[in-house]
Swiss-Prot record:
Positions of region (Disordered): 1-45, 160-186, 204-224, 658-683
Full protein name: Quinic acid utilization activator
Stored InterPro entries: Metabolic/Drug-Res_Regulator, Transcription_factor_dom_fun, Zn2-C6_fun-type_DNA-bd_sf, Zn2Cys6_DnaBD
Biased composition (Basic and acidic residues): 18-28, 165-174
Keywords: Activator, DNA-binding, Metal-binding, Nucleus, Quinate metabolism, Transcription, Transcription regulation, Zinc
PROSITE patterns: ZN2_CY6_FUNGAL_1 (PS00463), ZN2_CY6_FUNGAL_2 (PS50048)
Source species of the chain: Emericella nidulans (strain FGSC A4 / ATCC 38163 / CBS 112.46 / NRRL 194 / M139) (Aspergillus nidulans)
Keyword Glycosyltransferase: no
Gene3D superfamilies in the record: Zn(2)-C6 fungal-type DNA-binding domain
Molecular functions per Gene Ontology: DNA binding; DNA-binding transcription factor activity; DNA-binding transcription factor activity, RNA polymerase II-specific; zinc ion binding
Length: 825
C-alpha cells in the first residue's frame, strides 16, 4: 500500500503533520478521517489522548486508541489529567449534594446555616472577587484550607480517572476501616446541630452571638465546630469561648430580640434634626452624611454587623440619646400631653450607645470617640462632672492611641477620616471645660493643638444658613431669622482659641507661684481675642429680639463671659481683694441676661449642655476655702442663686422613667451637686428670684448693647493696636512665651503677638495672632464706628466706666425666665 506524505509549509521546513491516503484493493483511494469531503463539519471532542495533546495533533478521542495514533503506530493513552479553565467538572454538583446530605442527616442544620448566612455579610465578601484584598478574606481562606475541600477535590479526581482505576480506588475506599466507621454514623438519629439555650426559645431563626455545638453519639468525640473549618474545640470549653472568645473566632449569631434592640426607634429623623440644629452647629465633630448613611443602613443586617460600621453605629445611637433627652424635655417643661406614646426612652438609648463602645481591650474607631464625646455632653448637661471627666478621659486616650494628636504619624489609619481633627479638638474643648469646673489639670495643652492645627473653615457648615426644623422653639415665636451664613466652623475655631485661655487658667490655678503675672497675661490674651471678634459673632441684646442670633453664637458669647468671670475671680483671690469680686458678679449677671435672651429666642429644651458649666465657672472652687474663705462669704447670695439657676437648666437633661422630677439646687454655698439625678424640686410653681438685692439699682444700665467686663477696656496707648483691621480667617494657635507687656512695648505694633521676657517659673504660651496677616476674609471690625465696639475699645481718659444694661427688676426678670417653660407665673 502506497501513501503520499505531504508537509505543511513553514519557516523551519519541518513536517508539522503527516496525512496518509489509503487505497482499497482495486487501487481506488479511500477517504480518511481528515478528508474534508468525508467530514465537512469539524467535530470537537471532549478529551484528546495524551500523545495528540503533547504533539498538538488532531484527535478524534476514540478509545482505547484514536485514529491518529493508530495511523502513526504510536501509543495512545488517556492517563494525564487535563487542565481545564474554571471549576472542575462536578464541583458545583458535589457542593449541592454535600449540603443536601447535611440538611438531610443533621437535625437543625438548615436553620443554623440560614442564620449564619444572614449574619455573615456575604455581599461584602463577594465584592472582593478579583481584587487584591481577596487573599485576605478569612472566610475564603478558611474554606480553601479546610479538609472538606480536600475531600471534595479527591472525589473529583477520582471521577476523572479511567473506569479501571475507579474500580480499584472504590475497592480501596470500601476496605478503609476509618471511612467505614465514619459512614456508620450517618444515620438520621446520630448528628444534630443545636443553637445555644439562650436563643433556642426563639420561634424564628436566631441571630445571637454564640457557637453551635455538634453532638455526636459518643461524649468523647463531642466537638464544637468553629468557622475556620480546621479547628475543633471540646464541648466543655463552649462556655469559655462564648464569654471570652473574640468575635473573629466564632460565628456571629443574634436572636430576634437582639435584632429588635438594634432597630432604630420609631421615626428617628426628628431626633437627628434636633441634634444637627442645636449641637452640631457649635460642636461639629460629626459628618452629617455619615450619620444619615448609618441610619438608612440600620435595616440591613449585613451592613450593621460589618466591623467597619461599629464606630458609626455607636455615634448614631449617642446622637439619638442626646436628642431624645431634649425632645422629652419638651413635654416635661411645657406640660404637653399630646406627644406620641412610643417616643424613645432616653435611658435605653444611652445604655445602647454605651454598650456599643468597646472595652479597654477592644478595637476603637473614630465613631467610638465621637460617641464618648456626645455621651459626655449628656453628663455635662446633667452636671455629673465626675462621669463626664471619665468619659472625656477615655475619649482622649482613645484619640491618642489612634494617633489623632500627631498628624505626622502615618500609621494612624483613622486619621484619614474627614472629622479626625474635629474629634481631637473636641476632646480638647470638653476636657478643658470639665477640668476648669472640677479644678483639675487637663492632660491636653495648647502645645497639643499646635501639632494638629485648626480646622478648615471652607465647608458647607460654614456657609449654609442655620435652619430649625425641630419643635424646640416655641410655636408662638414669630421671630424671623436672617438667612445668613452659619459660620459653624469658624465659630468652633474661635471657641478653641478661647478654650486655650481657659486651659492655661487651669494650669495657673495649680501653680500659685508667680501666678499674678500670668493672670495678667491671660487678661491680655482674652482682650485680644474679643477685640478680634467680628460683630457677626457678638450678641447685641438690644436687637436680639428683632434679629436673633444662631444658637452657637449665643454659646460663644456665654463662654466668653464665663472665662472672663473666672479670670476676674482668680485675680480677686490672688490679690486678696474683696472688691475684686464685683467684677465676677457683673460677669454672672451678664451671663444671666444672655441666658434669658437665649431662652426667649428658643426655649429651655434647646439650651446647650455646657450652659450650666458656663454659669458656675466663675464660682469659687472648694480648694479656695483655705486661701480665701471670704470669697464664699462675700458672694454667698450670688453663688446660691447661680447654683439654683444651673440646677434648673439640668432639668432638661435629666430623664426619670417614673415621676418627672426636677433637681433641687444645692443648699450649701461652694458645693456642687455631683449628680442632679438624686435631687428634686417641688412642683411647677418654682420661682427663680433675683440674684442679689443690690442688682436692682439703676447704676448698671448703659446704652452699650455688647457686654464686656470693665477691665477689658483699653488704654490710650493700646488703642492704636486695637484699631487695626481684622485680617483673614480664624485665630491661630501657636506656642510662645509672653508676660504682661507695657504699653510702650506694643505701641504702633501689629496685633499679632505680645512678647516679653520669659519667666523661668512658668512658661505661658500665647495666641500669637488673632488673625493671620493675609487678605481680609472677614469685615474690618475696629475702624467702623457703627459696629458699636465702644465698650470693648473705649478710651478711659475720655469716657467714664460703663456697665452693661441689666433689667432693674430682676425679680420680674427671673419670674419671666422661669415661666418660659410654660408654667404659671
Amino acid at each position: 500500500m502506497s501513501s503520499d506524505t505531504r508537509q505543511t509549509s513553514g519557516g523551519n521546513a519541518r513536517s508539522k503533520r503527516r496525512l496518509t491516503d489509503a487505497v482499497d484493493e482495486d487501487g481506488r483511494p479511500t477517504a480518511t478521517a481528515e478528508d474534508p469531503t468525508s467530514n465537512p463539519k469539524r467535530q470537537r471532542v471532549s478529551r484528546a489522548c495524551d500523545s495528540c495533546r503533547s504533539k498538538k495533533d488532531k484527535c478524534d478521542g476514540a478509545q482505547p486508541i484514536c485514529s491518529t495514533c493508530a495511523s502513526l503506530s504510536r501509543p495512545c493513552t488517556y492517563r494525564a489529567n487535563p487542565k481545564k479553565r474554571g471549576l472542575p467538572t462536578g464541583y458545583i454538583r458535589t457542593l449541592e449534594l454535600l449540603w443536601g446530605l447535611v440538611f438531610n442527616k443533621i437535625q437543625g442544620s438548615e436553620e443554623v446555616v440560614r442564620t449564619l448566612l444572614r449574619a455573615a455579610n456575604i455581599p461584602s465578601h463577594l465584592a472582593t472577587m478579583g481584587k487584591e484584598s481577596e487573599g485576605s478574606d478569612t472566610l475564603l481562606s478558611s474554606w480553601k484550607n479546610s479538609i472538606v475541600l480536600k475531600e471534595i477535590e479527591r472525589l473529583l479526581t477520582f471521577l476523572e480517572q479511567p473506569e479501571g482505576d475507579q474500580e480499584r480506588s472504590a475497592r480501596g475506599e470500601i476496605d478503609s476501616p476509618a471511612d467505614a466507621e465514619e459512614s456508620s454514623v450517618l444515620s438520621p438519629e446520630t448528628l444534630e446541630w443545636q443553637l445555644p439555650d439562650s436563643i433556642a426559645v426563639a420561634s424564628q431563626s436566631p441571630l445571637a452571638s454564640g457557637p453551635s455545638p455538634v453532638r455526636l453519639p459518643r461524649p468523647s468525640t463531642t466537638r464544637l465546630v468553629r468557622d475556620s473549618g480546621t479547628q475543633t474545640i471540646p464541648l466543655g470549653e463552649i462556655e469559655d469561648l462564648t464569654t471570652n472568645g473574640s468575635s473573629h473566632d466564632r460565628p456571629v449569631i443574634a436572636s430576634n430580640s437582639a435584632r429588635e434592640e438594634h432597630r432604630l426607634p420609631p421615626n428617628p429623623w426628628p431626633l437627628l434634626d434636633i441634634y444637627f440644629s442645636y449641637t452640631q452647629c457649635w460642636f461639629p465633630i460629626l459628618e452629617k452624611h455619615d450619620i444619615l448613611r448609618t441610619a438608612f443602613r440600620q435595616g440591613d443586617d449585613d451592613q450593621y454587623n460589618s466591623p467597619s460600621a461599629a464606630g458609626d453605629n455607636a455615634a448614631l445611637w449617642a446622637v439619638l440619646a442626646l436628642a431624645s433627652i431634649q425632645q422629652t424635655s419638651i413635654s416635661t417643661t411645657r406640660q404637653l400631653s399630646d406627644l406620641p406614646e412610643d417616643r424613645p426612652d432616653p435611658d435605653q438609648l444611652y445604655a445602647k450607645a454605651r454598650s456599643l463602645i468597646p472595652t479597654e481591650s477592644g478595637t476603637y474607631q473614630l465613631g467610638h470617640i465621637q460617641a464618648l464625646l456626645i455621651l459626655s455632653l449628656i453628663k455635662l448637661g446633667q452636671q455629673d462632672c465626675a462621669a463626664a471627666w471619665m468619659l472625656v478621659g477615655q475619649a482622649v486616650r482613645s484619640a491618642q492611641s489612634l494617633g489623632l494628636n500627631d498628624p505626622s504619624d502615618a500609621t494612624g489609619v483613622e486619621k484619614t477620616a474627614g472629622r479626625s481633627k474635629h474629634v481631637f479638638l473636641g476632646c480638647f474643648v470638653l476636657e478643658t471645660l470639665v477640668a476648669a469646673k472640677l479644678g483639675l489639670l487637663p492632660s491636653l495643652r495648647k502645645t497639643d493643638l499646635t501639632k494638629v492645627g485648626l480646622i478648615n473653615e471652607d465647608g458647607l457648615e460654614e456657609w449654609h444658613p442655620w435652619e430649625d426644623q425641630t419643635g424646640l422653639r416655641p410655636i408662638e415665636s414669630s421671630r424671623s431669622f436672617q438667612r445668613g451664613p452659619l459660620h459653624a466652623l469658624s465659630t468652633f475655631n474661635r471657641l478653641l482659641s478661647l478654650m486655650c485661655i481657659l486651659n492655661e487658667l487651669c494650669c495657673v490655678r495649680q501653680t500659685p507661684a508667680n501666678s499674678m503675672s500670668y493672670l495678667g497675661t491671660l487678661e491680655r490674651q482674652l482682650q485680644l481675642w474679643v477685640s478680634a471678634l467680628p460683630t457677626s459673632y457678638r450678641i447685641d441684646l438690644q436687637t436680639v429680639s428683632t434679629k436673633p442670633a444662631s444658637p452657637h453664637i449665643f454659646g460663644l458669647e456665654m463662654m466668653y463671659e464665663a472665662v472672663a468671670t473666672a479670670i476676674s475671680l482668680q485675680l480677686a483671690v490672688q490679690k486678696n481683694e474683696r472688691n475684686g469680686l464685683r467684677r465676677a458678679s457683673e460677669g454672672s449677671k451678664r451671663l444671666v441676661s444672655l441666658l434669658q435672651a437665649y431662652m426667649e429666642t428658643y426655649s429651655l429644651s434647646a439650651t446647650c449642655p455646657t450652659f450650666g458649666i458656663a454659669l458656675t465657672l466663675g464660682l469659687p472652687l472648694p480648694c479656695m476655702k483655705k486661701t480665701a474663705p471670704w470669697a464664699f462669704e462675700a458672694s454667698h447670695g450670688i453663688n446660691h442663686k447661680l447654683q439654683s439657676f444651673s440646677a434648673h437648666l439640668a432639668t432638661v437633661w435629666i430623664h426619670n422613667t417614673g415621676s418627672q422630677r426636677r433637681p433641687r439646687h444645692a443648699t450649701q454655698q461652694g458645693t456642687h451637686p455631683r449628680s442632679p439625678m438624686a435631687i428634686s424640686l417641688p412642683g411647677n410653681n418654682m420661682r427663680l428670684t433675683n440674684l442679689i438685692e443690690e442688682s436692682r439699682t439703676g447704676n448698671l444700665s448703659t446704652t452699650d448693647s455688647y457686654l464686656s467686663p470693665t477691665w477689658m477696656r483699653t488704654s490710650n496707648d493700646e488703642n492704636a493696636v486695637l484699631s487695626l483691621p481684622t485680617p483673614a480667617s480664624s485665630l491661630n494657635i501657636a506656642s510662645g512665651v509672653e508676660t504682661n507687656p507695657t504699653s510702650q512695648q506694643i505701641t504702633h505694633q501689629h496685633r499679632s503677638s505680645v512678647v516679653g521676657k520669659p519667666n523661668s517659673a512658668l512658661i505661658m504660651s500665647d495666641l500669637t495672632t488673632p488673625f493671620p496677616a493675609s487678605g481680609h476674609h472677614y469685615q474690618q471690625t475696629y475702624d467702623d464706628a457703627s459696629l458699636h465696639f465702644n465698650s470693648l475699645a473705649d478710651i478711659e481718659s475720655t469716657s467714664s466706666a460703663q456697665r452693661p444694661r441689666i433689667a432693674p427688676d430682676l425679680d420680674a426678670l427671673f419670674d419671666e425666665l422661669a415661666s418660659l417653660d410654660g408654667t404659671d407665673r
